[in-house]
Amino acid sequence: DMQEAVVAHAKKLELKGAALIKKYNCNSNPLMLGLYQLLAEGRAARNWGMMAKCIKDPFIANRYAKIAKDETFHATIGRMELEKLCETQEAQDEINAVINDFRRDLHAINSAKTGELPEARELMAAYA
């Protein structure tokens, strides 16, 4: 049953970048929300954009491109908010304290769905 599968998938937050909203307290911390938007939504924008370029069906490719545009908009909001909020050393320190863990968590979520490429593993080692 397709509807049942959709509902079951929607409940698996550990497989989605949105799980980081809770982990990093993004709903009550504007700095963390900006970080989430910039990194997670930015990653989503790149992924949807890449899929839009690879899909042969023009209808689906167009839909994916629209999703990529929306995700880019959210990432831009995050970047703008961080630029505004990170004017103090305290705010910068708060971001710097979590950013590498955030990247690793986002990478783990992506890898759980698609597998991990050796190149991605090397890139993530830079954040150790």
Residue ranges and their predicted role:
Residues 1-128:
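Non-heme di-metal
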